[in-house]
């Protein structure tokens, strides 16, 4: 288990990293009008300069950010590979009814992908969606509901159950409980049914549509302690997909005992030298077909330096 000093160091490193992040100069800005309600959605993008079609990275902003405000993004890493990149606003900060993985959010992101396919030289066999925190939440939502054929999804620090997260946020006395009510409340009161309607954990899994798509779920083991989203959200969603996909091998699931160990001790016992994710130890990993859960030494974060190196395959 990490000491208080070590956890504090991780938190400080995150603050320094976020503070030093800058929006790349090469990003351009455009806008799209929603077919649902005429809303104007801002998008940031960068096109490949290659002579042949290249992959498309669709990055989704976090809960408290918009495409205008979020600074830490994978645009630099995408630019280094000369791939296409798009960063849509999809209703901005999650504090109003049309945000928070509403039908408007799903449609906005799908329309941003439409824009990219029309205006960029995209290899349509290699479209990737990535997001952290609220962006991880939106990434899971797109796995479940996007009309596009997406090759791979990379979800980090994800919310999967808005109803559970409301209760967790109330207990922690943070700002998110009030924002959840702003998204799904009825008469300014929390509405459990509406919360579940916005939760990928309760949605029907498109097993057939996603049979050739990869889903990589990443979560730092300290999230929920030093971060705002308990790792149970990622674990429960992973297990749900296996159940919906009728995975028969019980060893592929995260057992209750394993989940309890991870949640209560923020570690997992092993006699082997752990594999790494970038420079972080992988504490626990489960895989079923094209779906993988990775619990790593970290907190509520995305490791930008490894996202694109891992997004194309399970290895």
Predicted feature residues:
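Mobile cap/lid helix-loop segments that gate and shape the active-site cleft of serine hydrolases
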Residues: 64, 69, 152, 158, ...
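A domain-start/cap signature at the N-terminus of enzymes
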Residues: 19-54, 132-134, 172, 183, ...
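Short substrate-entry loop that stabilizes the transition state in hydrolases
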Residues: 51-54, 59-98, 162, 225-227
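Structural recognition of the beta-strand scaffold that forms the well-ordered cores
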Residues: 56-60, 84-89, 126-130, 152-157, ...
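Bacterial Sec-dependent N-terminal signal peptides
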Residues: 1-22
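C-terminal catalytic histidine-bearing segment of alpha/beta-hydrolase fold enzymes
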Residues: 216-218, 224-225, 231-315
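Primarily recognizes the serine-hydrolase "nucleophile elbow" in alpha/beta-hydrolase
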Residues: 65, 70, 117-119, 124-172
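Alpha/beta-hydrolase active-site loop
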Residues: 100-120
């Amino acid at each position: 288990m990490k000491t208080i000093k070590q956890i504090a160091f991780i938190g400080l490193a995150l603050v320094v990293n976020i503070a030093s992040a800058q929006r790349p100069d090469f990003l351009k800005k455009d806008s799209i009008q929603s077919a649902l309600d005429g809303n104007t959605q801002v998008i940031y993008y960068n096109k490949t300069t290659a002579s042949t079609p290249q992959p498309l990275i669709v990055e989704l902003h976090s809960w408290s950010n918009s495409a205008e405000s979020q600074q830490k993004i994978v645009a630099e890493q995408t630019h280094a590979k000369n791939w296409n990149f798009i960063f849509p606003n999809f209703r901005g900060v999650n504090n109003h009814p049309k945000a928070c993985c509403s039908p408007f959010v799903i449609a906005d992101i799908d329309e941003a992908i439409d824009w990219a396919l029309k205006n960029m030289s995209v290899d349509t066999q290699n479209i990737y969606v990535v997001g952290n925190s609220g962006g991880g939440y939106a990434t899971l939502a797109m796995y479940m509901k996007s009309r596009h054929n997406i090759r791979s999804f990379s979800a980090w620090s994800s919310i999967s159950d808005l109803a559970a997260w409301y209760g967790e946020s109330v207990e922690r006395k943070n700002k998110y409980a009030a924002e959840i009510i702003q998204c799904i409340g009825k008469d300014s009161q929390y509405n459990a049914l509406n919360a579940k309607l916005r939760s990928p954990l309760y949605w029907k899994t498109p097993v057939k549509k996603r049979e050739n798509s990869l889903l990589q779920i990443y979560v730092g083991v300290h999230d929920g302690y030093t971060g705002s989203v308990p790792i149970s959200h990622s674990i429960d969603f992973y297990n749900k997909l296996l159940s919906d996909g009728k995975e028969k091998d019980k060893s592929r699931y995260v057992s209750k005992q394993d989940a309890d160990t991870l949640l209560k001790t923020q570690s997992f016992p092993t006699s082997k030298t752990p594999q790494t994710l970038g420079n972080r130890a992988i504490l626990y990993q489960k895989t079923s077909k094209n779906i993988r859960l990775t619990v790593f030494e970290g907190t509520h974060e995305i490791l930008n330096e490894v996202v694109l190196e891992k997004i194309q395959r399970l290895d």
